[in-house]
Swiss-Prot record:
Subunit text: The nucleosome is a histone octamer containing two molecules each of H2A, H2B, H3 and H4 assembled in one H3-H4 heterotetramer and two H2A-H2B heterodimers. The octamer wraps approximately 147 bp of DNA.
Family that this chain belongs to: Belongs to the histone H2B family.
GO CC, any one term: nucleus
Protein name (database record): Histone H2B
InterPro entries: Histone-fold, Histone_H2A/H2B/H3, Histone_H2B, HISTONE_H2B_site
Main localization, broad class: nucleus
Cross-link (Glycyl lysine isopeptide (Lys-Gly) (interchain with G-Cter in SUMO)): K8, K9, K24, K25
Residue ranges with Basic and acidic residues bias: 1-10
Length: 138
């Protein structure tokens, strides 16, 4: 028997606005209350880099905006690069029989994955960030 029109729920749970901070995923549950009615599912939260991408955009081009589609593409790009670097760093640690990924493995994996000048700039910015973190942690 097909569901009644009143029982349909809108499917906006998976969408996140472009300027929101990274969020955690939570599993939503439907449970039956004493009256026999179903409770609404809690919205699942999605982790994104949207707020960070937006902050960098405003530093570089303060008067420029970004569409949700472009934000989604950039978020996928960041996730892809992050996964590639992490996988390569994991392989390097395994080759050297180490159980810990250090900044050295990350740096080497960035040099292997990114081409030429882009790798040099990435290593430079990464070194600068690690130095800044180390000096503030003391």
């Amino acid at each position: 028997m097909p569901p009644k029109a009143a029982e349909k729920k809108p499917s906006t749970a998976g969408k996140a606005p472009a300027g929101k901070a990274p969020e955690k995923k939570e599993a939503g549950k439907k449970t039956t209350a004493a009256g026999g009615e179903k409770k609404k599912r809690s919205k699942t939260r999605k982790e994104t880099y949207s707020s960070y991408i937006y902050k960098v955009l405003k530093q570089v081009h303060p008067d420029t905006g970004i569409s949700n589609r472009a934000m989604s593409i950039l978020n996928s790009f960041v996730n892809d690069i992050f996964e590639r670097v992490a996988t390569e760093a994991s392989k390097l640690a395994a080759y050297n029989k180490k159980s810990t990924i250090s900044s050295r493995e990350i740096q080497t994996s960035v040099r292997l994955i990114l081409p030429g000048e882009l790798a040099k700039h990435a290593v430079s910015e990464g070194t600068k960030a690690v130095t800044k973190y180390s000096s503030s942690a003391k």
